[in-house]
Amino acid sequence: MNSITAAVAVTSLMFAAQASAQWVKYPDSSIQWTRDGKPNLSEGAPKARDGKADLSGVWLPEPDPNGTPQGVESISGTVIPRYMLDITADLKPEDVPFRPSTEALFKQHLQSQGKDDPIAHCQPTGVPGLGAIPLPYKIIQMPRLIAILYEENSVFRQIFLEGRRLVNDPEPRWMGYSSGKWDRDTLVVDTVGFNDRSWLDRLGHPHSDALHVIERFRRRDAGHLEIEVTIDDPKAYTKPITYTQKATLVPDEDLLEYFCSENEKDVQHYK
């Protein structure tokens, strides 16, 4: 089994049972619906009461973020977003800006064929990887705070909008610490303060505790969200890595709780 096949297999086992774990057929009244009961996802992007772009809703990462069939189909039939599998999918192998120690660790992760993947042991996926997992997440928007609730492991993150400064040398966390600001209709989020225990993707690209993630959220229209992700980690990579993950609104579904430890049946096979 090669490294990519192993990564896809691990991902399939982790998410096959949760692929349709939403509260279905409860329509979102904040968007328009056609006479035949379908959501109008191409109408203009809504505005919040304060005039900012409204990012609220339940979103599902798209498998083909560049508009081409580049997602990888898992053994369960779920199409995995390409950046969940590989954040460097747009780069040639020789152009990945590894530092030597990072490249050595990445090769070690590849050789493990998924058994060392933190999510295979029910540890959090972390940021930005949660935005590429084929499970829904909900954005709740308020003037001074945006909360993102993820179905995967029922975790959440807070993005503070009141001008809060990111502290130096904070207590390391899986999700980091996020502060955001508006650039016209784009929400720009800076997140720092990570531990170094998560992987950036399922192939095993590592990061250090110096990771700085910059996300630019833009709602293109009612039904489509684009998140430009920049990974800036000077300890691990010689220059930033950027990709764009897209998501589609799922206006007639909601989240259900999901805990990996409650469903886990696979760790014994990695021993």
What is each PLM-predicted segment?
Residues 1-2:
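N-terminal secretory signal peptides that target proteins for export/translocation
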Residues 17-271:
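PEST-like low-complexity, intrinsically disordered acidic/proline/serine-rich tracts
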Residues 5-16:
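Bacterial N-terminal signal peptides
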